[in-house]
């Protein structure tokens, strides 16, 4: 898991060590900041999350997409030479500013529904870059409404936490298990990058992920007689 601000050379050095010295299949967990500030701000704003506050600091300090792509190509080749698998875990939570005393700190970490439109775009970019040949594990806003599509697109393992913190708790896993029970499991043969592109394209208008507008209550007093 790449902590915010972790230098690219350190990420590559750690992953290379795990592959060549420890002989481990290795996945690097990336941060949503890799999308760039302008894209993240624009996509969240368009979906009703304009109240979520963040600046460009983490976007500037974190791993950049232009550095990540060649590094992941190198690590994938290194893993293949060692008879191992290399892939990405998408994604870490997203740091945002505390503005209403939600927590006794300056930052908190966004997950769940609002994270999905960012993480699925990360999956789209990397899946297209590698034409589906790079393994992707998913964790950014996976839930009942997208887990089947993710799995069928060749993205797995899929992990989740936020959805089981909602009403129903661990009981939601039964619902998810029943949904996936009808999916055929096949050995990894590539990510369907065209299917992932469609998921990302649809995300900004998918009502499951749009922040609903709450109408202000009618405070007008009735006319007196």
Q: Locations of the language-model features?
A:
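Active-site beta->alpha loop and helix N-cap motifs at the rims of alpha/beta catalytic domains
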Residues: 1-9
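Secondary-structure boundary elements
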Residues: 8, 12, 16-27, 77-82
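Catalytic cores of alpha/beta
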Residues: 12-16, 142-160
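Structural preference for beta-strand elements that scaffold enzyme active sites
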Residues: 25-29, 83-89, 96, 133-137, ...
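Glycine/Thr-rich beta-alpha phosphate-binding loop at enzyme active sites
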Residues: 36-132, 167-185
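Glycine-rich adenosine-cofactor-binding loop
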Residues: 126, 133-134, 138-143
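Ferredoxin-type iron-sulfur electron-transfer modules and their immediate structural context
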Residues: 185-225
């Amino acid at each position: 898991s790449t902590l915010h601000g972790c230098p690219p050379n350190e990420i590559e050095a750690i992953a290379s060590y795990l592959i060549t010295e420890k002989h481990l299949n290795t996945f690097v967990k990336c941060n949503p900041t890799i999308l760039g500030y302008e894209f993240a701000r624009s996509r969240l704003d368009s979906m009703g999350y304009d109240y979520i506050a963040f600046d460009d600091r983490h976007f500037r300090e974190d791993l950049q997409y232009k550095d990540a792509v060649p590094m992941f190509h190198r690590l994938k080749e290194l893993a293949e030479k060692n008879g191992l698998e290399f892939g990405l875990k998408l994604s870490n939570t997203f740091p945002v500013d505390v503005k209403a005393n939600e927590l006794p700190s300056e930052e908190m970490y966004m997950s769940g529904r609002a994270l999905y439109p960012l993480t699925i775009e990360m999956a789209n970019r990397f899946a297209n870059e590698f034409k589906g040949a790079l393994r992707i594990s998913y964790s950014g806003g996976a839930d009942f409404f997208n887990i089947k599509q993710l799995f069928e697109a060749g993205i797995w393992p899929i992990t989740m936490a936020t959805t089981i913190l909602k009403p129903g708790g661990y009981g939601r896993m039964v619902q998810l298990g029943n949904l996936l029970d009808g999916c055929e499991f096949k050995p990894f043969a590539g990510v369907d990058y065209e299917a992932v592109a469609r998921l990302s394209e649809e995300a900004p208008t998918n009502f499951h992920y749009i922040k609903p507008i709450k109408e202000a209550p009618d405070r007008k007093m009735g006319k007196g007689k």
